[in-house]
Amino acid sequence: MFMGEYRHTIDAKGRLIVPAKFREQLGDSFVVTRGMDGCLFGYTQEEWNILETKLQKLPLTKKDARAFVRFFYSAATECEIDKQGRINIPKSLRTHAALQKKCVVVGVSNRFEIWSEDRWEAFADEAEENFDDIAENMIDFDL
């Protein structure tokens, strides 16, 4: 399980340090792709395979399903961690997430997210301000 918030910098070549606690879970390779809310999603190979099985069941006759799968897969990239504990994030993904210098890597249960510091701060401020309302709405999900 991924959890916690870690602040790192991304260098000019697009290399970002993966938190040590995450590296232990990720294995030899894992997948990073576009995420929602302007961040990137990272999955272990096992979690990616589970997600892939679900995505393959989406009906091709639904325009939104086709668009989502196309957008999600087209940016997916297999990553490997180098000897310094870094991954290289392709330019297209850096652009999607507005990754410049300061980044935040966040654990979110079965995946991790990579955010620009500015976007993360804006999201966290809004979520904190509305946390009670958000929590109240979670009752619909039996939490």
Curated annotation (Swiss-Prot):
Record's subcellular location: Cytoplasm, Nucleoid
InterPro entries registered for this protein in UniProt: MraZ, MraZ_C, MraZ_dom, MraZ_N, MraZ_sf, SpoVT-AbrB_dom, SpoVT-AbrB_sf
Molecular function terms from GO: DNA-binding transcription factor activity; transcription cis-regulatory region binding
Any single biological process term in GO: negative regulation of DNA-templated transcription initiation
Span of domain SpoVT-AbrB: 5-47, 76-119
Major localization listed first in the record, in broad terms: cytoplasm
Annotated signal sequence range: none
Keywords assigned: Cytoplasm, DNA-binding, Repeat, Transcription, Transcription regulation
SUPFAM superfamilies found in the cross-reference section: AbrB/MazE/MraZ-like
Taxonomy, superkingdom: Bacteria
Name of a matching Pfam family: MraZ
GO cellular component, one term: nucleoid
Membership in a protein family: Belongs to the MraZ family.
Name by which UniProt lists this protein: Transcriptional regulator MraZ
Annotated source species: Ligilactobacillus salivarius (strain UCC118)
